[in-house]
Amino acid sequence: MTTDEFKKPLERLLNAVVEKAVTEGLDLRRLRGVALYDSQKDSFIKALPEFAVVESGIKDLDQVRAQYGIEQSSRITLQLVYEYFARTNAISVDCALLEKLWADFVTELDIPVWRKRGVTNLRHFQLEDLHVDLGDGVSIHGRNPDVLASLGFQGEIWERLVADWSGFGASSHILVAESTIPKRPDNFITIDNGEVWLRCHRAIGAMRLIAPGEVGISTTFVQRVAHFNVGIGGVHSTGATVQTIGYPYTWPSEQRSLYDSTYAALAHLERIGYRKGPGNLDLALRAFMSTYDRFPFAVDTKLVDSITALEAMLGTESEIAFKLSFRVASLLASSDNQRAELLKAVKGFYDTRSRIVHGGRPGKKQNEYLAAVDDLRDMVRRLLGSFVLFAADDTRTVPKNFFAQDLDLVLVDAERRESLRRLLGLDASQPPRAPNTTSSMVSLIV
C-alpha cells in the first residue's frame, strides 16, 4: 500500500470512530490524547475492525519499517486518530482537515532525523537585541509568546517557563538549543539524548569564560519538534533553577569571535579529553562553573570553588600557597609591580580558603578577601579561558609534562615567561584570546 492509497482506510477508521462516539455519547476529550497513555481510550479505538486495516497499512510502509519499526504500528495508528481530533472542535470528519493531517504525517515520514529543541530562561542577562544566533543550533531570543510558539514552545512548556521566571536574576531573554539524530527504531521513544542540555551548558560556559557577570540558565525544557507527533507525549526537563544574587552579564557583542572560539574549544575538549591542558582542566572547569551554580549561594563557597579551579590548573603537592600565587601572578601580570600585587592577593585568597575549609571563623582580613571574591574569579576566568583555547589548539604545543615539571623554570626567566604568556594568549589585560602564533614551547625551556 502506498502512502496515497493509505488515506482511504484512515478516513474509514475516523468515520467509524465518529459513529461509535456519537452512539455512546462520548465527548471530544475522549478522542484526544497520546497513544498508550490511557489503555481505556486506546481499546475504544483498537476494537474497531477498521483499526486493523490501517495498522496493516502502516506496517507496509517502507519508511515506517526503516525509521520507526513495525512494532510501533499500533502506536502510530492510534496517534493518527488522536491527532486528528486534537485539531478539530467537532466529532465529525472534515476532509480538508484530514488532508492537512495526512500531509503532515507524510512530511514527517520524509524527514530522516528527529529534531529535539529545548528552551530555558536566561538569568542575570542583558542584551539590546531580540535575537542572536550563536551557531550550533543555539540562539538567544527576547521573551515573546509568539516567537516561542513559532519554535514549538506553547501550552505546557510556556506555562512552565513562565512559572520558572521569577526571583533574583530573572531576565527578558531565553536560550534555545536544538539538535538532531537520525531516525531509527531504537531511538523512536527518545525525547532527548542529553545533547540539547549540553549545548545550553556549553553556551553558558563560553559566555562565562569571556566576560564577567552572573549569567546562568534555569531548568531546561526539552521536547521533540515534529510536523506530526508519532505518539510521544510529555515534556522532558533537566537541570534546576538556582537563584543567585549578583550583577548582570551584558552580552559582549564585540567579542563574538572569542565566544565562537571558546564554544568550539569546549566542544572539542569534550570529545578528545582535557589531557593537553595544564593540570586537571576538567575539574577546573567544573569548579569554575560551581561558582555560579552552587546552591544555596554563599560567598565563602564561591571563594573555595575559585581556589579549587586554580589548584586544578596550577597547583602543586608542596608549598601550595606560595607556588600557586607565584604561578598565577607570573602568568597574568605584565609588570613587576602587578606581579607583586597579584602574588600578595592570591596568597591572601588562599589563606582565606584555608581558614574556611578547616572550619575557622573568618577574621577582618579574611572578610576583606571574601568581599573581593569576584576579583579572584576574574583571575580564574582569564587563566581558564586561555587554557581552554590552548588545550583545544593542535598548532600550539608544549613538551610532555611541561606544566608539571618545567613551568616554574620558565616563569623565573623574563624572556621565556613573556614568550609563554604570548603562546597562551595572556600577554594583554583583556580576556583570553587566540594568539597569532603556531610556535612550540620547546625553544623556551632548552
Spell out what each predicted region is.
Residues 1-68, 96-100, 253-332, 340-348:
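Amphipathic alpha-helical interface elements
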Residues 15, 53-301, 369-370, 378, ...:
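Charged, non-catalytic interaction/linker regions at domain boundaries
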Residues 306, 322-327, 362, 366-376:
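Composition- and surface-driven signal marking solvent-exposed, interaction-prone regions
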Residues 308-312, 355, 382:
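Residue-level signal for well-ordered alpha-helical scaffold segments within enzymatic catalytic domains
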Residues 315-318, 354-362, 385-393:
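Charged/polar positions within long, soluble alpha-helices
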Residues 320-334, 396-408:
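Short alpha-helical "patches" and their helix-cap loops
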Residues 340-368:
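Histidine-centered, metal-coordinating catalytic motifs and their short helical/loop contexts
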